Amino acid sequence: RAAADFLATVNLGSKPQWEFPLSPFPRPGGRATRVIYTEYDLPRETIEPHDVILDKDGFAWYSNFGEQNIGKLDPKTGKVTEYQVPEHKPGFPTGFLALRADRDGDLWLGNMYQATIVKFDRKAEKFSYWQLPKEQNIDAAQLNMVSPQSSHVDGKVWAQNNGFAGVHRLDLASGKIETWEPFKTAKEPHNIYDV
């Protein structure tokens, strides 16, 4: 509480007092503080889970930071099933960061230095891929975050490119990827972390 009270006094604005008073929620207690942690063994020591999400059926899906696969863990049995993603740029680093689901529960990933947007259809257990156009598919291209959450509205999936601070928009109907580089003429380096 003392730290929160102090931080609430820090004001670098032109007004002498914040317009929004500090109103912290009460600390949780009782049942809200009971937590059970369960650890699961993965099939190889080299697996580096980055993001983990639960689907509506209770399976835990993870992106693998250092390898070209995603994994599905059944928390009831501990069984892990891996799905191999082919390389699209042999010789470039592999792996994934963000793992997100669309409204249908299908999984989307940015295949980092492979410069590919990846969709995994959970029911069919099949991948679809969209590789960046040649002019953006440079050595530094790095697709980390893919955002399909509103793709059911307009058929568009957004992605960010950490390699050159770009934003991509995939049109699912045509497969065309549009690119914006808002910091292309900036004098200092910039980055776009997420969309």
Predicted regions and their residues:
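Beta-rich, blade/repeat-based domains predominating
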Residues: E45-D57, H88-D104, E135-G155, T185-V195
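Conserved beta-propeller blade signature
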Residues: F59-Y62, D106-L109, K156-A159
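A short loop-to-beta-strand structural motif that recurs across blades of beta-propeller domains
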Residues: N69-K72, A115-K119, A165-R169
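A short beta-strand motif characteristic of beta-propeller blades
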Residues: T38-L42, K79-K89, K126-D139, K176-T185
